[in-house]
Amino acid sequence: PAYNWWNEALHGVARAGTATMFPQAIGLAAMFDEEYLKTVAEVIATEARAKYNMQSAQGDRDIYKGLTLWSPNVNIFRDPRWGRGHETYGEDPYLTSRLGVAFIKGLQGDGEYLKTAACAKHFAVHSGPEGKRHEFDAHASQKDLWETYLPAFEAAVKEAGVESVMGAYNRTNGEPCCGSKTLLKDILRDTWGFEGHVVSDCWAICDFHQTHHV
């Protein structure tokens, strides 16, 4: 049957009926507690799996009903003016890495099969400005790229075995992230050994010619 890949679970299963709502990611990060966050993610995954079982049994495989959860957001919250900073675990790359790993492990479980499929987003250097995200070119030095923006994604791949990675809307150093050979092949696949699937942010492929003009 057809399967819709879009489901959200940043701090609870979203947009698919009643579910437990936990504090936003920035609030959960303030606990500095990896085990507690992993438990939160386990609850989210259990509810997502229960909803999926019920809805698929009824033949409902529409948007927000699947097991590919587009969470966590492991971007770095550098500028308080960024309107989506509350979705992140804050400004520290190390803390974001640790909490991202815990959340992913909680969502995916430790059984033979995935409980749900987590998605580390938005790869990479995606921290505003929100209004220009479809056309913005983020210029990051190699030092800043590897010490600030990539560690959480690297940990998600190498330590947590994240099943999916979402490309960002913006360009990074001239390349649209969702089509970047540097990010998606050289770093993600060849250097880190990622074996899962890559997903674009919503309609980001259209931005290649509509706003990035590449």
Model-found features: residue ranges?
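Glycoside hydrolase catalytic-domain context in secreted enzymes
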Residues: 1-214
